[in-house]
């Protein structure tokens, strides 16, 4: 099983190493210190940028899938109410069939909303293995002995980017890990809350999907706290950067392409009306006219 896992991750590890070394060379060329932790940290940020740009088409699909799931929640609730209290196999099978039929009729795919996260997971683990290897002095692809030694010695605020909270011998690593985990939790909370408060119809706030989102608001910080202490500083930098990208990307989408019947959509309509009025001397040509009797 371990050999199979290695064979899957090996190409991704090589890709991660080449991208990091490419950015490291570019930053070194423009005058940054090759041995600086900032140079290696920015190389990890560059890796995030490359991955997230490649995932933009899937992000668009994710948005459509999420909206589709929100729109069919009333029908989903009706199906659930229809079979409420029925636990026999025939009823459960019938409910499953009706749910799948609803997905087919509306062209909704629940898995599409998870694709960006699922596809990022292998890259995340590949980066973990590369940084873990750096800490052990292992070379891979373009990461030569010289670069591995350089990356292993590189520090950020006194913490080595290949070090972890659990294995750390310095207070700097522990403090930086805690700060990064807090920032990761804050960005995730902000992103989820932004989605729920601004881009979900009032009618959808009481459905199971919305309830799950509310629970995740408080579960994610616990997940970060438990798992984050096991990951190298460099992986936490990757995690925080991708969280910031997600937050900014979602802000752009909510502002420019909001879900109908939401506070974000009302704000978007108000901005559009203001733009039309500005072009027409302060009068919105699409505003409803009042009839004087």
What spans do the regions from the language model cover?
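Helix-loop-helix
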Residues: 1-293
């Amino acid at each position: 099983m371990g050999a199979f896992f290695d064979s899957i991750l090996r190409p991704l590890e090589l890709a991660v190493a080449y991208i990091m070394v490419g950015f490291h060379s570019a930053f070194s060329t423009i005058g940054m210190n090759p041995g600086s932790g900032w140079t290696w940290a920015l190389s990890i940020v560059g890796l995030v940028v490359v991955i997230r740009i490649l995932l933009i088409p899937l992000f668009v699909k994710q948005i459509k899938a999420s909206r589709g799931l929100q729109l069919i929640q009333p029908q989903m609730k009706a199906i659930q109410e229809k079979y409420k209290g029925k636990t026999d196999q025939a009823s459960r099978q019938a409910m499953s069939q009706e749910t799948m039929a609803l997905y087919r009729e509306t062209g909704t795919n629940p898995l599409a909303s998870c694709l960006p996260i699922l596809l990022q997971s292998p890259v995340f683990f590949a980066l973990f293995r590369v940084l873990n290897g750096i800490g052990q002095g292992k070379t891979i692809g373009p990461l030569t002995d010289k670069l591995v030694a350089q990356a292993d010695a590189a520090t950020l605020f006194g913490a080595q980017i290949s070090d972890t909270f659990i294995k750390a011998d310095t207070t700097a690593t522990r403090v930086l890990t805690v700060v990064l985990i807090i920032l990761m939790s804050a960005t995730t909370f902000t992103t989820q809350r932004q989605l729920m408060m601004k881009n979900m119809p009032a009618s959808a706030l009481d459905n199971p999907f919305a309830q799950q989102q509310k629970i995740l608001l408080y579960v994610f910080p616990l997940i970060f706290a438990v798992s984050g202490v096991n990951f190298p500083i460099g992986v936490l930098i990757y995690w925080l950067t991708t969280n910031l990208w997600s937050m900014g990307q979602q802000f752009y989408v909510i502002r420019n392409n909001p879900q109908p019947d939401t506070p974000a959509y009302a704000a978007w309509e108000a901005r559009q009306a203001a733009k039309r009025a500005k072009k027409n001397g302060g009068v919105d040509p699409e505003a409803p006219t009042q009839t004087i009797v």
